[in-house]
Regions:
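Hydrophobic ligand-binding cavity/cleft-lining segments
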Residues: 9-54
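Charge-dense, helix-prone N-terminal extensions
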Residues: 19, 26, 59-61, 73, ...
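Hydrophobic pocket/interface hotspot
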Residues: 34-35, 44, 63, 74, ...
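A solvent-exposed, acidic/Ser-Thr-rich amphipathic alpha-helical stretch
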Residues: 51-61, 65-66
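Hydrophobic-ligand binding "helix-grip"
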Residues: 64, 68-113, 118-121
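A conserved amphipathic terminal alpha-helix motif
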Residues: 119-145
Length: 145
């Protein structure tokens, strides 16, 4: 049984072996404000055009965002500094491993930045981050001015 499980894990690691690393700059905002967008259900919902977001700031809590299309668990929360979560899309195959997302927030001279590492994820997620998160967050912040 162990050998079968190990083989499945190896196969899945080849299928979803992409590691995405991105550093995104946001002008005129703070690390704290960016952190809030990810873990405040109302703000998270707003950046996605009202899609339901059930999320908390509590380590160990499960979450569901994008109208239930993305689910996971808060693995580590360092207020205003870091979020580590497991992620699973509702279209992933049953045997697919959960991906691990790490977001590190920091202030810069002109605003703030997010350093993202997303491991064990489908390749198409790289471009989806810009479309689904970075561009909508920038639009949301512009509306706040």
């Amino acid at each position: 049984m162990f050998v079968i499980l190990l083989c499945r894990i190896i196969i899945q690691s080849y299928k979803m072996n992409t590691v995405i690393e991105q550093t995104i700059q946001f002008k005129g905002t703070s690390a704290s404000a960016l952190f809030d967008i990810f873990l405040d259900p109302k703000k998270h919902s707003r950046i996605h055009g009202g899609a339901v977001a059930k999320i908390t700031r509590i380590e160990g809590d499960k979450f569901s965002v994008l109208d239930g299309n993305l689910n996971g668990k808060n693995l580590l929360i360092v207020p205003d500094r870091m979020i580590v979560q497991s992620w699973r899309g509702n279209v992933w195959e049953e045997n697919d491993l959960d991906s691990i997302l790490t977001l590190v927030f920091s202030n810069t001279k002109t605003g703030a930045q997010i350093y993202l590492t997303h491991s064990c994820t489908p390749k198409q997620f790289k471009e989806l981050w810009r479309k689904v998160y970075w561009d909508p967050i920038k639009e949301f912040l512009a509306e706040q001015d």
